[in-house]
Amino acid sequence: MKSCGLLPFTVLLALGILAPWTVEGGKNDAIKIGACPAKKPAQCLKLEKPQCRTDWECPGKQRCCQDACGSKCVNPVPIRKPVWRKPGRCVKTQARCMMLNPPNVCQRDGQCDGKYKCCEGICGKVCLPPM
């Protein structure tokens, strides 16, 4: 008889423990509003210690964005209407890096500034001027 009265208490206790965990777990995968600024082709002289791993480690509206040297908290730029293809062709690269999964700076042309296109570079996709 006493175990029936204990069941609702146990359920409420479990929900009280699990509810904050589910909220926090989802936050790590979510992203904040706005887009990371487009990355320009650049050489990194020294890899820096990452400032962040997720947007939620950055203050306010800042997003955790990758640049040539690592990840940093930066102010996002407004998201424009997505552009999948810009005019022009990508330059063919003759060399390839030996990295198994090279990091991509972009996925489509709309992520690159101005007339730059998202092209296959020596080591992953990068924003390059078209031919």
Swiss-Prot record:
Coiled coil segments of this chain: none
Site residues, Reactive bond for chymotrypsin, trypsin and elastase: 98-99
Annotated segments matching region Elastase inhibitory domain: 85-131
Tissue: Detected in bronchial epithelial cells. Detected in bronchoalveolar fluid after infection with M.tuberculosis (at protein level). Highest expression in lung, spleen, intestine and epididymis with lower levels in liver and seminal vesicle. No expression in brain, heart, kidney and muscle.
Keywords on record: Antibiotic, Antimicrobial, Disulfide bond, Immunity, Innate immunity, Protease inhibitor, Repeat, Secreted, Serine protease inhibitor, Signal
Keyword Repeat: yes
Disulfide cysteine pairs (residue numbers): 36-65, 44-69, 52-64, 58-73, 90-119, 97-123, 106-118, 112-127
Induction: Up-regulated by bacterial lipopolysaccharide. Up-regulated in lung after infection with M.tuberculosis. Down-regulated by IFNG. Up-regulated in lung in response to bacterial pneumonia. Up-regulated in macrophages after exposure to L.major. Not up-regulated in spleen in response to bacterial pneumonia. Up-regulated in wounded skin.
Name of the featured protein: Antileukoproteinase
Lineage, top ranks: Eukaryota, Metazoa, Chordata, Craniata, Vertebrata
Encoding gene, per UniProt annotation: Slpi
